[in-house]
């Protein structure tokens, strides 16, 4: 691209895209990307956070995405991004999902209309599942959502929601420092309200700290089984999750 054409493309990109943010109490805010095009050395205000709340996700969108917000007690809501009116940087946003006072939002995904991504959720005790996006009906923003995993004492609370395809691996980091990598293609599709399967085996006293979907490992990178990882190992994992 010529310099002039490149400048036009950059302006169009900035003018036509948005940042969507979500907080722990279920507030969602949408702002034009253009609002952040003149950063300051010490940063700029992006959202007003109410006392006791905190920002947990920020996603770049086209303005036409479908938004899913998931909560710790196992419910998730899906709605069109178009129902969220863009506002300026200085603002608190609107209600994305209604949750009980004892509950909290654990994550948000934004899926574009032509995407082939599925929804993957993971609980704090290592249970997870992959579900077709269409099993989550589109509803009005601000509702209570529908069950996305059957939370039990065995599964523990919901800890992560990710948008994935077979071309992804799931990276799981435990509080002990152990990093586990499992191929998403090994996780079969399951119904929306099911318990799922055991994705990883946690050692006593350990817990999941962070989860991320990453590009799948190539042939040159081996993805090992969690069960083959001995105590004290600091890396790998994956392979076929064990069904419960």
Where are these regions (language model features)?
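Single conserved hydrophobic/aromatic residue that forms the stacking wall/gate
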Residues: 1-5, 9
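A structural feature that tracks compact, well-ordered secondary-structure segments
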Residues: 18-36, 47, 58-61, 66-84, ...
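Per-blade loop-tip surfaces of WD-repeat and WD-like beta-propellers in eukaryotic adaptors/scaffolds
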Residues: 37-41
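Acidic/polar low-complexity surface segments
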Residues: 42-46, 92-97, 142-151
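Canonical WD40 repeat/beta-propeller blade segments in eukaryotic WD-repeat proteins
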Residues: 105-106
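Generic long, charged, amphipathic alpha-helical segments
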Residues: 140-164
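Acidic, low-complexity intrinsically disordered tails
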Residues: 212-244
């Amino acid at each position: 691209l010529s310099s002039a054409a490149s400048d036009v493309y950059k302006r169009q990109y900035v003018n036509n895209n948005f940042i969507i943010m979500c907080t722990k109490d279920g507030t969602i805010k949408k702002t034009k990307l253009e609002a952040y095009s003149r950063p300051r050395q010490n940063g700029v205000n992006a959202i007003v956070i109410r006392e006791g709340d905190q920002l947990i996700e920020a996603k770049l969108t086209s303005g036409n995405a479908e938004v899913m917000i998931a909560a710790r007690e196992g419910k998730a809501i899906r709605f069109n991004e178009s129902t969220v009116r863009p506002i300026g940087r200085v603002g608190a946003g609107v209600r994305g999902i209604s949750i009980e006072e004892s509950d909290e939002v654990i994550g948000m995904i934004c899926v574009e209309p032509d995407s082939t991504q599925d929804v993957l959720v993971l609980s704090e005790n290592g249970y997870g599942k992959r579900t077709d996006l269409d099993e989550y009906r589109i509803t009005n923003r601000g509702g209570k959502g529908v069950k996305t995993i059957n939370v039990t004492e065995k599964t523990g609370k919901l800890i992560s929601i990710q948008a994935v395809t077979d071309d992804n691996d799931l990276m799981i980091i435990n509080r002990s420092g152990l990093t586990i990598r499992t191929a998403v293609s090994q996780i079969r599709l399951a119904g929306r309200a099911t318990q799922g399967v055991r994705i990883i085996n946690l050692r006593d006293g350990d817990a999941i700290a962070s989860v991320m979907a990453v590009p799948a490992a190539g042939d040159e990178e081996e993805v090992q089984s969690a069960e083959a990882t001995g105590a004290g190992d600091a890396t790998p994992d994956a392979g076929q999750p064990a069904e419960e």
